[in-house]
């Protein structure tokens, strides 16, 4: 899948769109607890299509009449705003470091009830603010408002904040680039997620990650 394409919105009858509907159904099947609403997407390495995949899944869920919030927590290399063609604006980092209301920084996409929370201003300490009590309180509040909260994050093998987010989430999906990712790295990523006490729901193998 080409980077940056919202295929599930532009081509809802395509094979790829149908694959995302299958992913949605599988996640529903694996989630028996209705209070499990926060799902993290991460990858073994960088450039494996995590942002594009999670954005397409968010669109798929919104088209099924779910109220969805997509959070770009890849604070080092954010991409969600580019996928949805949104201008750089206040977002997650501003919400965590300033006295702002979440409703003032949420972006509506116009696709069903899909909202996005972009990464916000650049910071030097992503792990520190992700570890804050405010981050956890924010996620708890979002669970009372949205049916599903999807979190985009950087690679699990390199960054502490992804391990923290995995622990906060009700389920984690791992992205792997076919022909790009070594099996040893996949095994190590699974081990790191287990150490973070993450609920690993499954793996998505992305055929075209560039």
What are these language model-derived features?
Residues 40, 115, 152:
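Conserved beta-strand segments that form the floor/walls of ligand-binding pockets within enzyme
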Residues 1-47, 183-210:
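Short boundary/hinge segments that flank catalytic cores
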Residues 2-21, 25, 32, 43-45, ...:
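P-loop/Walker-type NTP enzyme "switch/lid" segment
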Residues 52-53, 57:
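Hydrophobic positions on the alpha1 helix immediately C-terminal to the Walker A/P-loop
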Residues 98, 127-210:
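Conserved catalytic-core segment of NTP-binding enzymes
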Residues 65-69:
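Helical hairpin unit composed of two closely spaced alpha helices linked by a short loop
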Residues 30-33, 64, 109, 145, ...:
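Alpha-helix C-cap/termination motif
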Residues 25, 59, 63, 167, ...:
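Short, well-ordered alpha-helices that flank and scaffold nucleotide-derived cofactor binding pockets
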């Amino acid at each position: 899948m080409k980077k940056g394409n919202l295929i599930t919105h532009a081509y809802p009858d395509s094979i790829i769109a149908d694959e995302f509907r299958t992913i949605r159904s599988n996640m529903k099947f694996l989630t028996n607890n209705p209070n499990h609403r926060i799902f993290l997407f991460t990858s073994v390495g960088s450039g494996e299509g995590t942002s594009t995949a999670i954005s397409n899944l968010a669109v798929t869920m919104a088209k099924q009449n779910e109220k969805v919030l997509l959070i770009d927590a890849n604070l080092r290399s954010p991409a969600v705003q580019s996928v949805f063609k949104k201008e750089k604006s206040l977002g997650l980092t501003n919400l965590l470091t300033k006295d702002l209301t979440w409703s003032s920084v949420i972006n509506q996409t116009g696709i069903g009830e899909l909202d996005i929370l972009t990464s916000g201003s650049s910071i030097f300490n992503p792990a520190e603010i992700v570890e804050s009590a405010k981050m956890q309180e924010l996620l708890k509040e979002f669970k009372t408002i949205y049916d599903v909260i999807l979190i985009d994050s950087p690679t699990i093998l390199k960054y502490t904040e992804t391990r923290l987010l995995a622990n906060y989430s009700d389920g984690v999906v791992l992205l792997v680039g076919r022909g790009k990712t070594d099996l040893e790295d996949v095994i190590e990523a699974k081990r790191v997620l287990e150490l973070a006490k993450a609920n690993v729901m499954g793996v998505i193998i992305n055929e075209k990650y560039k």
